[in-house]
Amino acid sequence: MKEKNTFGILIVLSSSLCFAIVPSSAKISLDFGSSLFILLFSRCLIGLVLLLPFLFFQKESVYIKKNYVLPVVFSSIVSVSLIAAVYHAIEYINIALGMTIVYAFPIGIALITSIRGEEKYSLREWLSILTVIFGLFILVYDEMFTGSLYGIVICIISLILMTTFVYTSSKLADSLGSIVLNFHLNLWSLIFLFISYVLFSFTLKIPDNSIGLTSLFFNGLFYILSYTLFFWGSRFIGVTRTSVLSLTDPIFATVIAMIFLNQFLSIIESLGFIVVLVSIYFFERSKITKKP
């Protein structure tokens, strides 16, 4: 049990490390001329292509039972809508504020699993979750207060979509497996994006140099790695613990920025950094000590 628990934690932390690269690679690709539609479409297409060899070598069937089709389609639509909503929101508000709102999704996951009787949480665990969110708030405090009410509303919608996507998809991953689930999520997302293009004629523009194209590829690569590892890890340690541990995403992003971009933290940001790490530690310690 202890080995399984440790393995699950390592998988989720690996997922967070991968996801920390996604926003930067997306921004570089967009800065070098990629349209948003191409970014989203290539992300799903790259994920689909990369998962095929794993399905082949593991001899996994891509076919799923009829009773799973509608839930998978629903999760795919929610996934694409989530990404579109987040990118739309940050056109109106600071990205730090937007991501802080969206990263509150573990509270939603904890509420759902608690109400449905799937998990029970102690007061210390609730306080740990809330303190993690507060730590993220401190971490991005200096950059937060710019934007509009409209952007905040869109971010709240994104938060609801994120909570819905993570909860429904984690349940599907328990039944279908992470690789099969992510294959279908990307497949149906591509279909949904294609239909959207036919209806609305979105701009198609690829990056205009090798740096942009490379960033486009890495965006798709680390996106599919992060979600595949996320749902794989949730099968070992549960969706709530996975969600809370995924809040290390901005921590990894901060460390990457410090190493490669020489962007160091202020005193307030450092305090937020420490609060997040300590809160996650106490949440995990509480979960582990509760296990028989």
List each model region and its residues:
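Glycine-/small-residue-enriched transmembrane alpha-helix faces in small-molecule transporters
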Residues: M1-I38, S42, I77, A85, ...
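Loop-to-transmembrane-helix transition segments
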Residues: F7-S15, S42, S61-A85, Y150-S158, ...
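Transmembrane alpha-helical segments that form core, pore/gating elements
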Residues: V12, S25-K27, L51, I109-A110, ...
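Specific transmembrane alpha-helical segments of multi-pass solute transporters/efflux pumps
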Residues: C18, P23, L52-A96, V102, ...
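C-terminal-most transmembrane helix of multi-pass membrane proteins
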Residues: C44, Y141, G212, L247-P292
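C-terminal transmembrane-helix exit sites in multi-pass transporters
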Residues: L50, L55, V86, F105-L127, ...
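Hydrophobic transmembrane alpha-helices of multi-pass small-molecule transport proteins
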Residues: L51, Y121-Y141, L193, I268-K287
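Helix-helix packing/entry segments at the starts of transmembrane helices
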Residues: G98-A104, S169-I191, Y223-I259
